[in-house]
């Protein structure tokens, strides 16, 4: 960890606890800051807040009183999920108090360089692929951000010869000031998180912050097939490395002759890749580009691609019951992810979908329903909207239920020999579950109860 004295004896407000706030508060206290922790959850049933209080921090729970800003606050470190429309953040902005997220704090204290990976879909898969390729290539990677350990904790322990591979959300990237990844990858952009950002444009601009502080000594890995990503990355000062699944890229990564190439050199043949789904070729091209830029040998990249079958909750094979294959794609929290999941199958699909209503309509799914879906069982807040889209698609079997466990039972009842039963919600999980991981685990448990 760098020697950091900027926070000594400064009053710093950590807004929102969860994993990132808890880690940030502990880090700041270790750096000599006077840490004030604020969380909306009452202290009586807030275990993390109680732990921080026991460590001598000033903890205020049960609301976000504006009076906190009267304590000569030098900096606010906010939980990524708390919107900037929160009255406390609005008041802090008016007082010109800097507001950052935990990833910015991690960058400021890290000895190791960062790799940042963002996009609407494929972040987790690409981050894991990158980590595995760097590990195979003996580049001493550590993984942090939305997956793995909280970035602050990893950054504290990281040495200069390591590299931090981070999956970054738009929420995290809105709160960066000096964050400068050595390599920044922008995978794709799809309309998502409208409840937080308001418009696709604002969402895209938040993602593009990943390039904000890059210089000519850095690299920007960009999806050349995504017009929005190309536009949003146009002002990046990093060396641009493009990747494409549809056209040849001389100075980047592409597909030709049934193989993946980087800067004109064949790296791996597609037949050697075990990760299913055409969409995953984009993720592989991005990860391969990062690995090659850091000097990983082709042999190491090929070794990873011959064994990497995917990440949990992303098109995860669960089991086969009476020749019905079950797949868990709980990480599909937006429409594009579900489109890509459906496109991965040639067998008839019984789709389980639904969840938090973020204001999206689901008409974009209609052609995928028509081509791939035999029946749909919906649940959660968005069930009526999904039913409407399924009716437009002319699906013969459409059913809405209240809970995921019931949806699993009904999907199985509608299935036949050779069908795929797929959980790919196209929605966030927070209407009924704490996380998409919890949703996926409950799906898996419900499937095993059918046996």
From Swiss-Prot:
Annotated metabolic or biological route of this protein: Cell wall biogenesis; peptidoglycan biosynthesis
Biological process annotations from GO: cell division; cell wall organization; peptidoglycan biosynthetic process; regulation of cell shape
Annotated ATP binding sites: 119-125
SUPFAM superfamilies according to UniProt: MurCD N-terminal domain, MurD-like peptide ligases, catalytic domain, MurD-like peptide ligases, peptide-binding domain
Top-level lineage group: Bacteria
An example Gene Ontology molecular-function term: UDP-N-acetylmuramoylalanine-D-glutamate ligase activity
InterPro entries in UniProt: Mur-like_cat_sf, Mur_ligase_C, Mur_ligase_C_dom_sf, Mur_ligase_cen, MurD
Catalysed reactions, as listed in the record: UDP-N-acetyl-alpha-D-muramoyl-L-alanine + D-glutamate + ATP = UDP-N-acetyl-alpha-D-muramoyl-L-alanyl-D-glutamate + ADP + phosphate + H(+)
GO cellular component: cytoplasm
Subcellular location: Cytoplasm
Signal peptide feature range: none
UniProt-listed Enzyme Commission number(s): 6.3.2.9
Keyword Flavoprotein attached: no
Main localization category: cytoplasm
Pfam family, one: Mur_ligase_C
Keyword Cell wall biogenesis/degradation applies: yes
Keywords (A to Z) from UniProt: ATP-binding, Cell cycle, Cell division, Cell shape, Cell wall biogenesis/degradation, Cytoplasm, Ligase, Nucleotide-binding, Peptidoglycan synthesis
Family from the record: Belongs to the MurCDEF family.
Reported function: Cell wall formation. Catalyzes the addition of glutamate to the nucleotide precursor UDP-N-acetylmuramoyl-L-alanine (UMA).
Protein name: UDP-N-acetylmuramoylalanine--D-glutamate ligase
